[in-house]
């Protein structure tokens, strides 16, 4: 059967399908928990800051280990690292579903992040070595569309499973998917690696991981302990020192975890900053809009998930088209326009009342569908066109780390803003006060992303990085 379905001509598309299958699973877990949070909170008796850790623990570990995951993929084999990542993620998903306390759930979510950090950079680097430059934008468009689709479908799938089974099943469902993903990877993905065999940068891993953890900890726990407390000020000092030491170390390492020469290309810098800022603005929105729909508007878990469908459908339709448009015209104005749309969406959301109907929400959801598609797909395509094929693993790891750092920081930042306005006990009025301020801040962040993209990404970025990748593809 495989011989009839998979040929030399179409194998690269089957490879893309296998990669997208695994990618969908790990990206889904960024947002699938959002509509289940009220149920998790009730059953496990968790506070708001603990709920933030359920989401941020995954995103933070994902981000902190992403660069090392890219290095592992390039050095030891992209398929091997991808498959090992699926196995870790699958086992951690089982542990999440079996968790009987908030602490156990957070620990299992951290383990999920380890698996995801191995899988995600391998997906883009597999695409980079599989597709020639003329098709890479389309392939990355499908990749980015899959990622955005998973993020958008997460609330709906989470709502259906939470309401008709239990919150545990948002994690249990990953187990059969993971097993199928491992089988598909061995059948459909060819092994590839960078033969330079550079050693791992453990000091870089330690300092970057500590810095990101300290930053997120300070933002999430600031309201609990006081922003001027020794604990929180100390966390921010540790974050600043650790991240500064990380950059200094990377400049001196013979085989750095983060290849700083990548940032000599301003298009690559612009694409990564755009990805970081869109995640910073949007991940917190998914988190708190889900809470708003259920705790303020009275939506059920399924209704809250279904409310995101207009955005989901638009992402399905537009993300691949955005990839093709990026191939033809470059990414600069697509990203800029997408970020402007997201800024308008967030400003609109900030003006919602505590009795808004779905039809009032709809314009913002439509804007979000267009904005996410026009931003995430072209950002990914621009970044990967700007790196040579031998740097594909670390190049994609940096891009995805920016998204996850932005996501975990965004949730922490929006949570800190919300918590600063919540009364004890929380009231609808205090929730709406914090909700409005958080979304205004998110809108400003999205607008900053538009300005960044317009200033840094070259108008004809489609040509950058094509030659080295083309030569490598032809040599293969």
Where are these regions (language model features)?
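Intrinsic disorder in cytosolic terminal tails and internal cytosolic loops
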Residues: 1-11, 194, 456-476
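Flexible interhelical linker loops that connect adjacent transmembrane helices
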Residues: 5-6, 182-209, 251-266, 327, ...
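Transmembrane core module of solute transporters
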Residues: 12-61, 166, 203, 217, ...
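MFS transmembrane alpha-helix packing/gate-lining sites
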Residues: 29, 58-65, 115, 146-150, ...
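Interfacial helix-cap and linker-helix signal at transmembrane-aqueous boundaries
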Residues: 40-41, 72-73, 157-165, 219, ...
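Helix-loop-helix hairpins in multi-pass membrane proteins, especially solute transporters
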Residues: 71-204, 230-231, 305, 321, ...
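C-terminal module of multi-pass small-molecule transporters
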Residues: 77-86, 95, 100-103, 107, ...
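C-terminal membrane-cytosol helix-exit motif in multi-pass small-molecule transporters
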Residues: 136, 175-194, 209-221, 238-253, ...
């Amino acid at each position: 059967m495989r011989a009839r379905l998979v040929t030399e001509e179409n194998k690269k598309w089957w490879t893309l399908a296998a990669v997208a299958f695994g990618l969908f699973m790990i990206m889904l877990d960024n947002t699938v928990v959002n509509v289940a949070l009220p149920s998790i909170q009730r059953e496990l008796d968790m506070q708001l800051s603990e709920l933030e850790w359920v989401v941020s623990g995954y995103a933070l570990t994902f981000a902190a280990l992403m660069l090392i995951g890219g290095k592992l993929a390039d050095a030891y084999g992209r398929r091997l690292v991808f498959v090992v990542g699926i196995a870790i993620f699958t086992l951690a998903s089982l542990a999440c579903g079996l968790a009987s306390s908030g602490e156990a759930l957070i620990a299992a979510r951290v383990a999920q992040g380890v698996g995801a950090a191995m899988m995600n950079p391998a997906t883009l680097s597999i695409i980079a070595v599989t597709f020639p430059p003329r098709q890479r934008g389309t392939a990355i468009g499908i990749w980015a569309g899959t990622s955005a689709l998973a993020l958008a479908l997460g609330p709906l799938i989470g709502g259906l499973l939470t309401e008709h089974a239990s919150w545990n099943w948002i994690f249990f469902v990953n187990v059969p998917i993971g097993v199928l993903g491992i089988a598909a990877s061995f059948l459909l993905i060819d092994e590839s690696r960078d033969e330079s065999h550079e050693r791992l940068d453990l000091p870089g891993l330690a300092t970057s991981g500590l810095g990101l953890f300290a930053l997120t900890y300070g933002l999430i726990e600031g309201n609990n302990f006081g922003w001027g407390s020794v604990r929180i000020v100390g966390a921010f000092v540790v974050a600043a020192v650790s991240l500064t030491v990380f950059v200094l170390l990377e400049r001196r390492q013979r085989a750095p975890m983060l290849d700083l020469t990548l940032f000599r290309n301003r298009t690559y810098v612009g694409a990564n900053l755009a990805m970081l800022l869109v995640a910073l603005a949007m991940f917190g929105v998914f988190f708190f809009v889900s809470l708003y729909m259920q705790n303020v508007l009275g939506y059920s878990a399924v209704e809250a998930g279904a409310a995101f469908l207009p955005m989901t459908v638009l992402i399905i339709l537009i993300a691949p088209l955005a990839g093709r448009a990026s191939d033809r015209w470059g990414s600069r104005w697509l990203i800029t326009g997408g970020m402007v749309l997201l800024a308008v969406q967030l400003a609109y959301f900030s003006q919602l009342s505590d009795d808004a109907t779905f039809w009032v929400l709809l314009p913002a959801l439509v804007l979000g569908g267009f904005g996410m598609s026009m931003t995430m797909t072209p950002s990914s395509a621009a970044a990967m066109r700007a790196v040579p094929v031998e740097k594909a693993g670390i190049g994609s790891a940096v891009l995805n780390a920016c998204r996850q750092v932005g996501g975990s920081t965004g949730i922490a930042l929006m949570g800190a803003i919300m918590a600063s306005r919540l009364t004890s006990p929380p009231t609808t009025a205090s929730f709406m006060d914090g909700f409005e301020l958080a979304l205004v801040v998110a809108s400003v962040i999205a607008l900053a992303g538009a300005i960044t993209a317009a200033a840094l990404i070259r108008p004809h970025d489609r040509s950058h990085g094509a030659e080295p990748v083309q030569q490598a593809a032809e040599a293969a």
